Every structure is written in structure tokens, then in C-alpha cells.
């Protein structure tokens, strides 16, 4: 586990905060250093053990997509190498896992796009026949492809709280009609293009979450992470079957173990502290992340 980074400590830059997975530092007035650690969060609780290489995998995967989708929407990239903004002794902490990005004004709405019925979307549909207030045809099954991808936004929650699904009308009220529609249309376009590409690599992108901010001119800008195994549900196309829970290339291993684990004979209540992850779950999860990178991008971990 020696190559794992649970939390960065960059003392040469002001720390802005630790997120669930990322540590953010200020680089001057207009840029940020984002370090993707090997922390893993499941059910909005941060696990106590790192997943080796996970941060580097996510960073490389996000950078791949930012480049691939740059013609659709501006993104937060600056082209400044992370190694150049930290002290020499700190370079090892940022190598392969950090980016220097534009400092944006974040839009506090998660832009979720679903192409398939899965997870909380499937639960919503079973209960109401809708997902986030969007009427869907009757008789759909778990993991079924939707007639068209749908935009199902969520309100960003405080750390440790669950993000809350909201209707498109609520997004319009929060950020204004024009910006809400632009965000929806761009999100669906990003999803469609990514899903088309992933299909050629034998991967289904069931759903994904985009995050946007506004730059100093008020331009909508893609930020944070994009189409990684943390922000998306990736399914291998060769084992996909409607009506089942397809195995995904993400933290599903950890989630399944957490659902099954018993603490003093009782299920884990999905609140901190998390139970200690066994080594085999950590190793299998690390392997899944690496496999997702190679299958999707054709790149080895750099």
C-alpha cells in the first residue's frame, strides 16, 4: 500500500479544503491545485483506507475526457503542470494525481445525466414511474436503456449529507432559466458523445455526473472531474443484461461489501465511521479502477 496517498500535505500553498476525495489549494488569486487522493467515499461516508493508484487513475481518466470533449464546452484546464507550483519536496505528492485549474464560481447543482435506469433512478421509477419528476414509459426494467438520455439534477449537499434529487423547475429557480437550459443541453450532449465513444471500447456509460462553474466572464465551464469511475456508472457491455444489476467498474465492490457486512450482528447504518475494508476488497477495487482506465482510454496508468 506504499504507493497510496490518503491525504496530501502541501505546505507551500494555502489549503482551501479537503473534499471527499480531492484536496484543494490556492495557486495565486485565480487558480487552484486539485490533488486527487486515494480516498474512497461510499454512501457519502469516507472509508478509512486508501485504494492504491485510485487518485492517479481518476486524474488520468478525467484529463482524457477533458481533452476529448473540449470542442463542446470550455473546461477548467490551464495547461500549468502541477509539479511547477509546489516545493521540490512535495512533487511526489502531486505527480500523476494533481492538476492546476482555473478558479471558477461553482454552480451548486450536480448535472446528472442518465441513459439507463439504475441505482436511485431505478428506485424512484419503481415507486413513482418517474425519475426526478420526469415521466417515463411504463414497464421498464432495472438497467434498461432509456428511450433518450434524461437530465436529472441534484442539489449539492454539505459534506457527509446525501445529494438531493431536484426537478428541472427547481434548477431554473436556483440559477435562472437560460443557464439551467444551457447546462442541461450541454450535459446531454457531453453524455451522448462520451457514451458513443465508450461503446466502441465495450463499455456502457449508464449514468454520469458533471459539475460546472462560471468563469470571470460568466461563461459556463466544465470543472471538477469528468466521466471517471467515481462520477459515472460504467458497465462492461459483454456481461450486460436487462433486469439485473450489472457489475460496474467503480466502487460497487465496496458498496456490495458494505451492504452485506454486519457490525455486532447489525447492518452498517451508512454513517461514519465506516467499517474497516478487508485487503481483498481494497485490492479488487484498485484492480477495477485500473481496468476501467485501460479499457476505456486504451492508456496504461502513467
Curated annotation (Swiss-Prot):
PROSITE patterns: SAICAR_SYNTHETASE_1, SAICAR_SYNTHETASE_2. Gene3D superfamilies: ATP-grasp fold, B domain, Phosphorylase Kinase, domain 1. Pathway: Purine metabolism; IMP biosynthesis via de novo pathway; 5-amino-1-(5-phospho-D-ribosyl)imidazole-4-carboxamide from 5-amino-1-(5-phospho-D-ribosyl)imidazole-4-carboxylate: step 1/2. It holds the Pfam family SAICAR_synt. Keywords: ATP-binding, Ligase, Nucleotide-binding, Purine biosynthesis. InterPro entries: SAICAR_synt/ADE2_N (IPR028923), SAICAR_synth (IPR001636), SAICAR_synthetase_CS (IPR018236). The keyword Ligase applies. GO terms for cellular component: cytoplasm. GO terms for molecular function: ATP binding; phosphoribosylaminoimidazolesuccinocarboxamide synthase activity. SUPFAM superfamilies: SAICAR synthase-like (SSF56104). HAMAP family: SAICAR_synth. This is Phosphoribosylaminoimidazole-succinocarboxamide synthase. The lineage of its organism: Bacteria, Pseudomonadati, Pseudomonadota, Betaproteobacteria, Burkholderiales.
